């Protein structure tokens, strides 16, 4: 293999842990791991380590959990490790300019889109939401901007009509490590070819919110069906019935025009719950009332038929 690099890894969720795992199998020397501080989780609000911390401790790696990398003493933690490169994957902290310049080869980031499309916090979800035909991962050289650095390597994958953010996340968690290992080899060999991002092609992947995930029946059925897949597994598309939130796990588009007002229930039977939208009909197939498990439309109709009387409107 190429020269073994001294690497600092910075990441937090499972997506990042899969990249750390690949690094540890690659023959490079991971000299330190930075991850977010333990956070309260679950009903008991017990402090829980990140997936990256769990893996790093299993492998006996030094772990650092600063709240910020702005203080001088925390930047010194990075400097003391004398790394060739810092690999950043869904870390969640901003790296100041001083930190970006510490490693000999700088800092590189694995981003879950084909940059410059979908810079920002929710690239996987936004690619689905927008109806993109493909997405992928970009390995880039980090600079002080938000996902603005030169691109070093890209891998793409198609987005299917069945993909959710959950399935795309898994696909990119397979692609990312492949791209990362290839990029590190090129950096070690001096064969990397940085490519400047075309600013005319930039789009921004804004954070998702629970309020955005509320179903807006004035949108087209096609857009709503994409939203349902984009917001799965979080924050989950939802509607409100009798003051209760009901999550929607799966729906299909019926490409038939209707004069009914958006939100009007047209049919409710074993084929699904058919609702008029701003364009076409959305057929709700799998739903989850508050406090219950997800169930088919037919099962929900068996217990709550009064919720879905044809002619009534969902708000």
UniProtKB/Swiss-Prot annotation:
Q: Which domain of life is it from?
A: Bacteria
User: Which EC number(s) does the record attach to this protein?
Assistant: 2.1.2.9
Please provide the record's keywords in A-Z order.
Answer: Protein biosynthesis, Transferase
Which amino acids does the record list as binding (6S)-5,6,7,8-tetrahydrofolate? Answer: 113-116
Under the heading InterPro entries, the entry gives: Fmt (IPR005794), Formyl_trans_C (IPR005793), Formyl_trans_C_sf (IPR037022), Formyl_transf_N (IPR002376), Formyl_transf_N_sf (IPR036477), Formyl_transferase-like_C_sf (IPR011034), GART_AS (IPR001555), Met-tRNA-FMT_C (IPR044135)
What is the reaction catalyzed? L-methionyl-tRNA(fMet) + (6R)-10-formyltetrahydrofolate = N-formyl-L-methionyl-tRNA(fMet) + (6S)-5,6,7,8-tetrahydrofolate + H(+)
Q: What is a GO molecular function of this protein?
A: methionyl-tRNA formyltransferase activity
> A GO CC term?
cytosol
Entry-linked PROSITE patterns: GART
By sequence similarity, the record places it as follows:
Belongs to the Fmt family.
What job does this protein perform?
Answer: Attaches a formyl group to the free amino group of methionyl-tRNA(fMet). The formyl group appears to play a dual role in the initiator identity of N-formylmethionyl-tRNA by promoting its recognition by IF2 and preventing the misappropriation of this tRNA by the elongation apparatus.
Entry protein name: Methionyl-tRNA formyltransferase
The gene designation is fmt
